[in-house]
């Protein structure tokens, strides 16, 4: 369905399904006909890093029509329980055609995607356009996506102007990729946002030397993160080791 075609009330329904899944984790549920698509092979080798965790945690998130489940409890019994909670929880709000009698539409849980192993429990998984490594706590872009972004940036450096609507699409792609996957990447977008400010609809953006320099920097950074995944600790800052009142009116690092 995608973000643009999703009415606001759909997100309310998907969030409700997420809440139902959270509660169903506490309940023993019957088998679901699709659960075997999600469960790993009984002999699959699980990452040692995750098995050694002392405290376990379950996380369920909904992004428009995508449901994301995360856990560090890798016992098969828990994966079965989590899988059933997700399947039954989604079907409790978005019921299958066999219940509603609806004809001509797609089922709420895509069997085709499950057959492509998109729902399989894995510690390395592509989620919302990013490859997440739950054992090593890293994040990176798929190689094909990096190559496509680099090709776009190289083309931009050869142009003098570009239509606003095309520039907006490129800026959105770059922002999704750089602001989330490059430490401090947001700081490179000041000139990009400034270039669009005040530009009339259906207007053109002049690709100045400053913009082209930023494109060169981004191209180099994307090449670097493609070779070395980014640790999530670099993206989400922790609290400082020492913090307190810096002066009488401002709270920050340092103190007297």
Stretches found by the model and what they are:
Residues 5, 119-235:
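C-terminal reverse transcriptase regions that engage the nucleic-acid substrate
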Residues 47-54, 229-238:
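A short acidic-Thr-Gly-centered motif at the start of a beta-strand
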Residues 235-256:
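RNase H-like nuclease fold core
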Residues 1, 69, 74-75, 132, ...:
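Conserved beta-strand elements of beta-rich interaction domains across eukaryotes
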Residues 1-58, 64-65, 75-87, 161-187:
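Conserved pre-motif C helix in the palm subdomain of viral-like polymerases
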Residues 76-100, 149:
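Well-ordered, non-membrane alpha-helical segments in soluble/globular domains
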Residues 103-126:
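Short, conserved micro-motifs composed of acidic
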Residues 24-28, 92-107:
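Flexible helix-coil linker/hinge segments at domain or subdomain boundaries
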């Amino acid at each position: 369905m995608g973000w643009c075609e999703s009415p606001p009330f759909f997100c309310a329904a998907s969030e409700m399904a997420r809440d139902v899944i959270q509660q169903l984790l506490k309940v023993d549920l019957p088998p679901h006909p699709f659960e075997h698509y999600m469960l790993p092979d009984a002999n699959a080798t699980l990452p040692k890093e995750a098995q050694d965790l002392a405290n376990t945690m379950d996380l369920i998130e909904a992004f428009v029509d995508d449901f994301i489940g995360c856990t560090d409890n890798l016992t098969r019994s828990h994966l079965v329980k989590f899988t059933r909670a997700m399947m039954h929880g989604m079907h409790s709000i978005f019921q299958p055609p066999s219940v509603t009698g609806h004809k001509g539409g797609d089922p709420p849980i895509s069997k085709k995607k499950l057959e492509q192993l998109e729902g399989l429990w894995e510690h390395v998984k592509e989620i919302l356009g990013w490859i997440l490594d739950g054992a090593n706590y890293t994040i990176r872009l798929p190689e094909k996506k990096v190559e496509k972004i680099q090709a776009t940036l190289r083309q931009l450096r050869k142009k003098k102007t570009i239509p606003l609507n095309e520039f907006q699409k490129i800026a959105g792609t770059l922002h999704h990729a750089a602001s989330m996957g490059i430490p401090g990447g947001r700081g490179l977008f000041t000139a990009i946002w400034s270039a669009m400010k005040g530009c009339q609809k259906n207007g053109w953006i002049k690709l100045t030397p400053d913009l082209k320099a930023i494109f060169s920097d981004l191209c180099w950074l994307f090449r670097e993160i493609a070779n070395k995944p980014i640790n999530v600790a670099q993206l989400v800052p922790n609290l400082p080791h020492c913090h307190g009142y810096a002066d009488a009116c401002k709270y920050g690092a340092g103190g007297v």
